[in-house]
Amino acid sequence: MNRFTVRSKFIKFSFQLFRNYSVCLNSSKSLIRVEGVDAVKFLQGLTTNKITLDNPVYTGFLNTQGRVLFDSFIYPKVSNNGTENERSDELYVEIDKVAESDFLKHLKKYNLRSRCSIAKIPSEELSIKVIWDVKEESRLKDTVAYAKDPRFSKQRLLRMIVPTSTCTSSSSGSLDDYKVFRYRNGIPEGPQEIIPSISFPLESNMDWMKGIDFHKGCYLGQELTVRTYYTGVTRKRIFPFIIPNYEDNPSQVIEPSAPLSIVAKQGEPVSRRSPGKIIAILGKVGLALVRLQYLKSDLACNGIPIQLNTSIWLDELSSTPSENS
């Protein structure tokens, strides 16, 4: 191997190491505009986080039983000088595209006397852009709204609402790249991973992902969520995993919702109780909902060993009241 070959490989490695990724989520996300003097008050009564015209938030919409209907980001409009415009009563709600119809019905069901309008923004007009592995904050030209994604405590991911023409012309990654990045960091998203009317917000890590304000006023589904946080026990959580020997047999099949099993050591009885289930998977990485009592156990799915990464939520595991009850 000559010096040129070595240098070429180093340059290629350096480029991969220091590049950042960006993806236009036009095909998977929808934007809803909520505008009017009661826009904040209206959304405040439906969401788990505190809504203001000052800061974007990650949040959830619950049903009356305290189960998640939708996970979402809510953005205030950015003024022309790049700051949040406090004079505007306009908020943008990012929602998964497959949930768009149900979400609009949900909002309109509760929008009885509120002085605000609710409308879908055409996908040809505005789109969500995500950028990650960035060393410093940067915004695209003509950014309409902007947020540092609070779910990633150890990584930096930026979200912004931009004209669709700008969004699609400047992408350097794919939706699969975005999914892999989320999975490696233990971040569930959308109705395929946070199952509507089934998932609980704490089991889905919405508190760890800074999507719940436990000190705000009343909102739909609040009672069970707050009671569980302060007095109950959250027995299951979502964690990232990898398939250690994936390269040896990439055709191994693991599907979402498949149950986990415990790999019993020689001489030990096999537990009949499933320790959890697969939430999502792409290649060798994925997310699993796991009972906390089995975090130190050797786990498998369909006979295929998986390896949890609990370190991603180590601080949250040690400091969350519900886990220490």
Curated annotation (Swiss-Prot):
<dbReference type="GO" id="GO:0005739">
    <property type="term" value="C:mitochondrion"/>
</dbReference>
<keyword id="KW-0809">Transit peptide</keyword>
<dbReference type="GO" id="GO:0005759">
    <property type="term" value="C:mitochondrial matrix"/>
</dbReference>
<protein>
    <recommendedName>
        <fullName>Iron-sulfur cluster assembly factor IBA57, mitochondrial</fullName>
    </recommendedName>
</protein>
<dbReference type="GO" id="GO:0120510">
    <property type="term" value="C:mitochondrial [4Fe-4S] assembly complex"/>
</dbReference>
<comment type="similarity">
    <text>Belongs to the GcvT family. CAF17/IBA57 subfamily.</text>
</comment>
<feature type="transit peptide" description="Mitochondrion">
    <location>
        <begin position="1"/>
        <end position="21"/>
    </location>
</feature>
<dbReference type="GO" id="GO:0016740">
    <property type="term" value="F:transferase activity"/>
</dbReference>
<dbReference type="GO" id="GO:0016226">
    <property type="term" value="P:iron-sulfur cluster assembly"/>
</dbReference>
<dbReference type="InterPro" id="IPR027266">
    <property type="entry name" value="TrmE/GcvT_dom1"/>
</dbReference>
<dbReference type="InterPro" id="IPR045179">
    <property type="entry name" value="YgfZ/GcvT"/>
</dbReference>
<dbReference type="Pfam" id="PF25455">
    <property type="entry name" value="Beta-barrel_CAF17_C"/>
</dbReference>
<dbReference type="InterPro" id="IPR017703">
    <property type="entry name" value="YgfZ/GcvT_CS"/>
</dbReference>
<dbReference type="GO" id="GO:0044572">
    <property type="term" value="P:[4Fe-4S] cluster assembly"/>
</dbReference>
<keyword id="KW-0496">Mitochondrion</keyword>
